Amino acid sequence: MAQQRAYRYFDLVMVAFVTVLVCSNLIGPAKIAQVDWPLLGPLTFGAGVLFFPISYVFGDILTEVYGYGRSRRVIWAGFGALGFAAIMAWVIVKLPPAPFWHNQGAYEIAFGSTWRIALASLIAFVCGEFVNSFVLAKMKILTAGRWLWTRTIGSTIFGEGVDSLLFYPLAFYGTGIIPNDKLPLVMLSQFVFKVGVEVVFTPVTYKLVGWLKRAEHEDYYDRDTDFNPFTLKT
């Protein structure tokens, strides 16, 4: 049996990925923000979208350095953490408050996401992340490891596209929270914003990828990888 490589920083990148994922989904959605941009005017968005794209940056780093197989395990770890956070929030919100505690309403607003939104978030996350990782791994082979920016941005376009196409209709269609005729505009604006974050972080991604490849003595190519998402093999 082949001995598994021991990596110095893989677990830290995994923790960073899961932390950004859970925090952006648990803390961010409760607040709707509006920022006035020069020339563009006011932009309204769910606050979680500000940080969620960073999970794609870490996803790109994981696949680029360690390969699809290890990235797949991290995606499922993130899925489990996000699912547990959703269940925990639901249970705590449903607990009857003490008679002297008068903050139940505010707590429900902050952490009382409906099951429809929570389920939509889980489905969109896992599908989008696997598409992102798959596209990056395949593009790395096609480009022979050159032009990292084409892989990070290209894979994010596909991954975030799938995420947005799944999340917004599954979470909001027919609910009245977002009018049905406004959903395409909301999806497009959020998609453009998320891809823009990836573009802005490209220099940081280059630095981290280069440093990790040197530190780990690893630059994985998924030439013989089983891309089945429903396995934990590395």
PLM segments and residue spans:
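Alpha-helical transmembrane segments and their lipid-water interface positions
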Residues: 28, 32, 85-93, 128, ...
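Membrane-interface interhelical connector segments
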Residues: 91-116
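Short, highly charged, low-complexity non-transmembrane loops/tails of multi-pass membrane proteins
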Residues: 209-234
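Alpha-helical transmembrane segments of multi-pass membrane proteins
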Residues: 18-34
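N-terminal membrane topogenic signal
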Residues: 1-16
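Internal alpha-helical transmembrane segments of multi-pass membrane proteins
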Residues: 142-161
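Structural signature of hydrophobic alpha-helical transmembrane segments
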Residues: 42-52
